[in-house]
Design a protein with these regions (language model features):
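A general structural signal for well-ordered alpha-helical segments in protein cores
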Residues: 17, 39-43, 81-82, 207-211, ...
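NAD(P)-dinucleotide binding in Rossmann-like oxidoreductases
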Residues: 103, 123-208, 226
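C-terminal helix-rich "cap/oligomerization" subdomain common to oxidoreductases
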Residues: 198-200, 208-253
């Protein structure tokens, strides 16, 4: 709902999304859309390390819900990762390969999508609501570095090529142990690889989101998730849903 004073909004329907964004701009209102994962401290830590990502692997798994079963997992869960990916890659989508399978409901309960972007980046995204555990992870491959981050635990680590000073000071290492949080320099096929934790200042994403909105409203700042950014994610999510529905063999005949 949009009123003359500043207001937050849940994800609107497609027919209303861009109209809502345009109306907010015309009225000088601050419109922020509730993609709460954008306010996870993990994402802030990731952006500090991000340099021209080439491949993203995103996984979001959840137990079967007692709500939102009237929509598929793309609109229920994956849309949050779609919005994040568009924000991180910042390049037009050139192609979409999507598959989705209904398991316990009429819509897709598990879906996998591969995006190819104009700048050459590829993103592989999996969302499922048929899982015994909650998993929310993002992995980023970029030049000379790999990042693995966990939204749920607000933790992560970085693998990168060693700097010259690290090459000189370190001895010959063993294979990297992913169970430790300490900095390790490893010799691997003639390359020195450093594994180190990603510093995450932990916090409650919903609280951060609300505080961010209030600050934007008070100071007239641009929201982290604008109406247009959310509309772009919604358009893409609905296109994925359409392709999954059209490929459903139950529609044949």
């Amino acid at each position: 709902m949009l009123v003359p004073h500043r207001v937050g909004a849940a994800e609107p329907a497609r027919a209303e999304a861009r109209e809502l964004a345009a109306l907010a701009a015309a009225k000088g209102c601050v419109l922020q859309v509730g993609h709460v994962e954008r306010f996870n401290p993990v994402l802030h830590a990731l952006e500090a390390q991000l340099k021209n990502p080439r491949f993203l692997e995103v996984t979001r798994l959840s137990p079967f819900p007692n709500r939102s079963t009237d929509i598929g997992v793309v609109l229920d869960l994956m849309i949050h990762d779609i919005e994040i990916i568009l924000h991180l890659v910042r390049s037009p989508v050139e192609s979409i390969d999507a598959v989705g399978i209904p398991v316990l409901s009429r819509g897709e309960d598990i879906a996998n999508v591969r995006f190819r972007f104009a700048n050459g980046c590829v993103a592989n995204v999996t969302a499922s609501r048929i899982s015994q555990e909650r998993v929310r992870k993002i992995r980023v491959f970029q030049e000379n570095a790999y990042l693995s981050l966990d939204y749920k635990n607000q933790s992560g680590y970085l693998l990168r090529l060693a700097r010259e000073d690290e090459k000189e000071s370190s001895g010959l290492g063993k294979l990297i142990s992913l169970a430790t949080d300490s900095k390790i320099v490893t010799d691997f096929s003639g390359h020195r690889i450093v594994r180190e934790p990603v510093e995450v200042e932990k916090g409650e994403p919903l609280r951060i989101e609300l505080e961010s909105f209030l600050q934007c409203a008070r100071e007239g700042l641009k929201p982290r998730v604008t109406g247009l950014a959310a509309a772009d994610a919604l358009d893409l999510a609905l296109e994925i849903t359409r392709r999954i529905e059209e490929s459903d063999p139950r529609r044949a005949g």
